[in-house]
Amino acid sequence: MKLLNIALDGPAAAGKSTIAKLLAAKLSMIYVDTGAMYRAITYKYLQQNKPEDFDQLIETTELSLTYDKDKGQRVILDNQDVTDYLRENDVTNHVSYVASKEAVRTFSVNKQQELAAKKGIVMDGRDIGTVVLPDADLKVYMIASVEERAVRRQKDNEERGIVSNVEQLKQEIADRDQYDMNRDISPLKKADDAITVDTTGKSIEIVTQEILALVHKIS
């Protein structure tokens, strides 16, 4: 199979990361979790007591992704592995705000494009098909109902030992959608040439097979 770049976009908790990891494994490609980059910068932002100067924050930031056979992708921020801190509630609640800043976005997109330059990448996020990889070989826009996404997020939280309420999560997800779709820089939107895949009520295996079928059509 020829080397491809695959872009998966969509709102929070639509299943992008889970599916992207599986696709990459099945296709012997590299998975790049772009959300982890923004979460890492958000983690630093919180550790530094929410500075307002994002240009300075980025100037002092070193960020890289490494790949461990057993642990998968690891995020190295300023020479420290911060992967295990990136799903904390405080990071989740601030990541949209931090990711909307131009300095943060420019820094992260440049990193992502460098990673994709050699192809063979499955990348998920909110602006991959529109901004990061506009020439991706396959663009998929994943959606799911707010209700289902809230249940998924609660399940993820439970697995991490975090107590959460579905109704509250529904509101947070709906608010996040509005923020992401209406921000000035790299808003969440479907690329004109992206294929929509609705994951509502579907198992991980079924969604993965649907997207694999799309890959095989172009490879």
UniProtKB/Swiss-Prot annotation:
Principal EC category: transferase
Record GO terms (molecular function): ATP binding; CMP kinase activity; dCMP kinase activity
Gene Ontology terms: biological process: nucleobase-containing small molecule interconversion; pyrimidine nucleotide metabolic process
Any one GO cellular component localisation term in the record: cytosol
Keywords linked to the UniProt accession: ATP-binding, Cytoplasm, Kinase, Nucleotide-binding, Transferase
SUPFAM superfamilies found in the cross-reference section: P-loop containing nucleoside triphosphate hydrolases (SSF52540)
Pfam name, any one: Cytidylate_kin
InterPro entries given in the database record: Cytidylate_kin, Cytidylate_kinase_dom, P-loop_NTPase
Coiled coil: none
Subcellular location(s) per record: Cytoplasm
EC number: 2.7.4.25
Gene3D superfamilies: P-loop containing nucleotide triphosphate hydrolases
Residues that coordinate or bind ATP: G10, P11, A12, A13, A14, G15, K16, S17, T18
Protein family: Belongs to the cytidylate kinase family. Type 1 subfamily.
Name assigned to this protein: Cytidylate kinase
